[in-house]
């Protein structure tokens, strides 16, 4: 299934993080935190301003970003979990 976000929405695939501690202990539950980094897999056409102008997004497909977990929608697409969020929830692009 192909998915296309609307307006200022961005779709990410969350980066996997290490589930073992430095000592080799497998972390589970609250000790195994979710990553707040992800790879952009789709972007909307931009934010519509009050005057009708469409402002393009700053992120593009393939960018690795750091995002705020608040306001993120998890969705299963073809058995794969993706994250849908507004560009406002993206804090930085990792270069």
UniProtKB/Swiss-Prot annotation:
GO terms for biological process: chaperone cofactor-dependent protein refolding. The keyword Oxidoreductase does not apply. CDD domains: cpn10 (cd00320). It comes from Glaesserella parasuis serovar 5 (strain SH0165) (Haemophilus parasuis). The gene is groES. Together with the chaperonin GroEL, plays an essential role in assisting protein folding. The GroEL-GroES system forms a nano-cage that allows encapsulation of the non-native substrate proteins and provides a physical environment optimized to promote and accelerate protein folding. GroES binds to the apical surface of the GroEL ring, thereby capping the opening of the GroEL channel. It holds the Pfam family Cpn10. This is Co-chaperonin GroES. Disulfide bonds: none annotated. Belongs to the GroES chaperonin family. It comes from the Bacteria. It is found in: Cytoplasm. Gene3D superfamilies: GroES chaperonin. One of its GO terms (cellular component) is cytoplasm. Keywords: Chaperone, Cytoplasm. The keyword DNA repair does not apply. GO terms for molecular function: ATP binding; metal ion binding; protein folding chaperone; protein-folding chaperone binding; unfolded protein binding.
